[in-house]
UniProtKB/Swiss-Prot annotation:
It comes from Methanocaldococcus jannaschii (strain ATCC 43067 / DSM 2661 / JAL-1 / JCM 10045 / NBRC 100440). Signal peptide: none annotated. CRISPR (clustered regularly interspaced short palindromic repeat) is an adaptive immune system that provides protection against mobile genetic elements (viruses, transposable elements and conjugative plasmids). CRISPR clusters contain spacers, sequences complementary to antecedent mobile elements, and target invading nucleic acids. CRISPR clusters are transcribed and processed into CRISPR RNA (crRNA). Residues 1-92 form the HD domain. This is CRISPR system single-strand-specific deoxyribonuclease Cas10/Csm1 (subtype III-A). Part of the Csm effector complex, that includes Cas10/Csm1, Csm2, Csm3, Csm4, Csm5 and mature crRNA. Stable Cas10/Csm1-Csm4 and Cas10-Csm1-Csm3-Csm4 subcomplexes can be isolated; Cas10 and Csm3 probably do not directly interact. It comes from the Archaea. PANTHER family: CRISPR SYSTEM SINGLE-STRAND-SPECIFIC DEOXYRIBONUCLEASE CAS10/CSM1 (SUBTYPE III-A), CRISPR SYSTEM SINGLE-STRAND-SPECIFIC DEOXYRIBONUCLEASE CAS10_CSM1 (SUBTYPE III-A). GO terms for biological process: defense response to virus.
Amino acid sequence: MGNCNEYTALKIGALLHDIGKFIQRASDKPKSKGHDKFGYEFLKEKFKNGFLNHLDEKTKDKILEIVKEHHNQKIKDDLIGIVRLADWLSSGERREPKGDPENVEVLNTEEQKLLSIFETVCIGELTENLYKNGFKYSLKPLNVSDAIFTDKPYPNENYKELFSKFEDEIKDFKGDVSFEELYQLMQKYTWCIPSVTMWKKAGSLKGGLPDVSLFDHSKTTCAIACCLYQMYVKENKKKNKYAKEYIDDKTLEKLFNNDNGWNKEIFSLIHGDLSGIQDFVFTITTKYATKSLKGRSFYLDFLTEYFAKYICKELNLPITNILFYGGGHFYILSYKVDENLINKLEKEINEVLFNMFRTKIYITIAEVGVTPNDFKKSEDKESKEKTWGFAKKWKEVSEKTVEKKLRRFEYKLEGLFEPYNRGSENRCVICRNEFDKNEKGYAIRENESKSERICDYCASFVALTDILKNFQMEKTIKFNKAYPIIHLTKNKDNLSLQREEFSFLTVKAIEKLESKFRVLSDENYFLKEYKLPHDSGELIIPYKIWAIAFPIIENETEKRILDFDGLAEKAFERTGTRKIGILKMDVDNLGEIFTTGLGNDATISRMSTLSSMLTLFFTGYIPHLIKNEEFEVNGKKYKFKDNIYLVYAGGDDTLIVGAWDAVWELAKRIRGDFKKFVCYNPYITLSAGIVFVNPKFEFKKAVNMAEEELENGKNYIIYEDEETEKKVDKNALTVFNCPMNWDLEVEYNEYCWTKLKSYLEGINKEMVELESLVKKFNEDDLEKNLKKQLKRQIRKESYI
C-alpha cells in the first residue's frame, strides 16, 4: 500500500468513514450510539487484533480519528474537515443533513434494505410508495450470479448473517494488505447496504430514497477527499505541481459556512474515449479469427482500464477516482488540472499507440471544470432543464470529447503523410499488414504439417487469447506466469520445435506499454495475481471481473478453443443447419439514462451506483451465464459454454459468436435476465441484432451486418402518439432485417404490460387491442417461422 503516511490515512479513513453503519445494523442495540462511534470501536478492536498491521500506530490513530469525528461540526480543518466535506459532496448536500422528526421516514433496522437504483430511473417525482413496493437487494456478499438480481419488495436476509461473513473475511486482512484489497472488501460486503435510511416524505433528504449503496457512497467520498487533499496546502506539506487550484483550512471553513467558493471550479471531470475499436478488432482473416479475436477485443478493453489507471498514477489519485471504465470509455474525478496537462497526457499516450499501430487506435481525453455546487442535487423543481448536477458535467465532458475527437492527430499531421509501407507482398496472414523491415514475426500453425507467418503484434493477440484461455481454466490471473502457446513458434520450417512461451507481461503489445507507463508494476493500480469469479459466482479477494468465456475442447495433447467450423458443426448436429450466429446487444438510450434518467437527484454516488451495476451485469453476469447455464433443443439440453465464444462484454454492450441455435437461445436468455436485473423498468431496455452466416464468411462483414440489424432495432417504433409525444420504440430483437419488440411481439410478459400501462397514462384503444393480440402470440410459432425463413434465406444466399 506504500509508505504509511497522512495520505494513506486519508484514503483508508475516507473509504471506511461510514463502516459503523454496517456494524450498527448488525448490532443487538443499534440505537445505543451513533454509527461513527460504532465504526470507531470496531476498527480500534480490529487494529489491536492485527487488522492492517503493516500500518504504523500514528496512521492507525489518524484513521480512527477520521471515522470517529467525521460528523463533528466543530472540526472544519485538516483531514477530518476534508473527509467531512467530501461526505457532503458525495451525498449531494451543502450542509449537515437534519430531518424534521414529524416529516421524516426512518426505517427499522431489519427493514433497512437497498432499493435498486433502476427503480428510480426516469420515473419523475419520487414517491413514498416507491420504496414500499420497489424491489430491494438481499443482504448477500457480492457475486456475479444471483445476488445482483432482485424481485422482492421485502428480502428476508438479516444484517447479522452478512456481518458474520464480513468478520470472518477481515481476519485475513493482516500483513501488507493493498488498498485495492481493502476496496474490494468494502465492495463485496457493503454493495447491498443503503448509505442512508431516512428521507423526507415530501421531497428528499440526503439523497432521497435509499438507492445508493454504502460502497458507492464510500468510494466517491474517498475519491472527493483525495482530490481535496491533493489541493490542500499547510505547513510542511509539499504543493502538488499539477493542481491548478489550492485550498487551506480557511478555504475549508468558508465552504462549511457556505460563505463562498461553492461556484469555483476546484475539481475536474476527465473523460477518455478510445477510437478505432471496430476496425482494430475485426479487420482480421476469418481463418485464424478464434485464435486472436478475443486477444484483440480484450486488449482494447484492457487499454481503457490501463490508461485510466495511468492518469490516476500521474495525478497521484487512487482507483476510487475512476468513476467508470468500459466500452472504450473512462471517467475520472480529479482535482482541477490545466487543460495543457490533459493534452500532454493525450499526446504521450497516442505517441506510443501510433508507434505500435499507426492510426488504427487513438485516444481522446478531455476535461471540464467542476464546482462544489455541481455535486449538489437540484432544488429547483420547476426547472425545465433536463440535466442536473453531476450528470450535467458528465454530459458536458462527453460532448467536449466528441468535438475534440474531430481533430485527432492534429499535433503530428506531417508525420501522417510520411511514407510508411514499402509495397511489399510480405504480409501478415491475419491483419494483412506488411512486415517491418527487420521483423521476423512468428509461424502460426494451421495444422500438424503447415504454418504461415504472422507479425509480432498479431502473435501478441494469439498469445493473449491463449493466456486468457488458461486464466479461464485455472480461474486465476497470474501476470508473471508463462504459458506455452500451442499455435506459435519462431521457426516456420520446423513445427515440431517447442512452442513459444509468453506471460501476460511479455507479449509485445503489453511489454511496449509497460516500458513507457509502468502501471502493471505499480501495486497501487494492479496486483500480481487475481482470482476470476468462481463457477458459483463467488468473488474471492483479490478478484478481477474480466469477461472471459471460451468453448474449449480437449484431446490427449492439448486444450484448444473451438473454431467457427467446430461451432457450426455443433449446430448442424442438432438442427441440420451448419451456420454460426453473431449477436450484438446493447442498452438503449444509455446516454440519456446517465444524463437525464436520475433527474435532479443525479449525485456522483448515485451515478457511481448506476454505472457499477450495469458493469456487473455485462462484465460479470453474462460470462457467468455462458459458463454455467444450459439451453434446450428438441427436448435435449446442451451447455452454452460448449457452443459460445464471448468476444466482448462490458460497459453496456456485448458481442457473441457461436453455434447459431445456441446464440438464438442465449439472446433470449440475456434479454430476459436483463429485464429482471433492471426491475422491469420499461425505460431501461436492451436491443439486439443477430445474423446467421457460413463459418467461413468474412468475419468483419458479418459483424457489420449484425451491427446493422442492431441499428434497425434501435430505429424501430411500434407505437407513437404525436399529440402526447409518447411512443414505444427500440427494445427490439432484429433478425433477417425484421425488428420485433421484445415485450409486444416476441413474447407476452404480463408484469411488463402492467408496468408499461402504469407509466403510459391514458393508454389508447389500439394499445389495449395490441395487448390482446400479443397474449395469443406464441414464441414457439415465431421460432418455427424463423427456422423456415432461415432455410429460405440459406437457399437464397447459398453463395455465402
